């Protein structure tokens, strides 16, 4: 998995925006794999993507965040909270609000609370 993460990190490099969708989609099966439990590198890779929040990747980001939340709700909510705190852009909050209706119910309510506090 560590070599795979290196490859995905290259796909998700800011200079390779055309590869971002592929990189995000590649992470979902890794996260849901029972053998994988190292989420911090995933959050590190995803940070710049969530800060940019391109509209074209909304569904990919939504799927990835839902998978992360299923694996570790606390870590995922903390990651989102820290991302919102560390950016001056409104794009992440706007994108997250757009995603809300399609997220699992418990994730929706917890994310609403984070959005209320941080925006």
Language-model features, listed with the residues they occupy:
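Alpha-helical scaffold domains
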Residues: 1-119
């Amino acid at each position: 998995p560590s070599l795979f993460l290196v490859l995905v990190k290259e796909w998700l490099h800011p200079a390779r925006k055309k590869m971002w969708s592929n990189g995000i989609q590649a992470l979902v099966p890794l996260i849901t794999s029972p053998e994988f439990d190292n989420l911090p590198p995933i959050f590190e890779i995803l940070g710049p993507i969530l800060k940019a929040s391109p509209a074209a990747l909304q569904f990919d980001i939504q799927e990835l965040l839902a998978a992360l939340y299923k694996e570790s709700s606390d870590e995922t909510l903390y990651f989102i909270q820290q991302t919102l705190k560390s950016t001056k852009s409104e794009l992440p909050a706007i994108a997250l609000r757009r995603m809300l209706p399609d997220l699992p119910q418990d994730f929706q309510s917890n994310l609403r609370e984070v959005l209320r506090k941080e925006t």
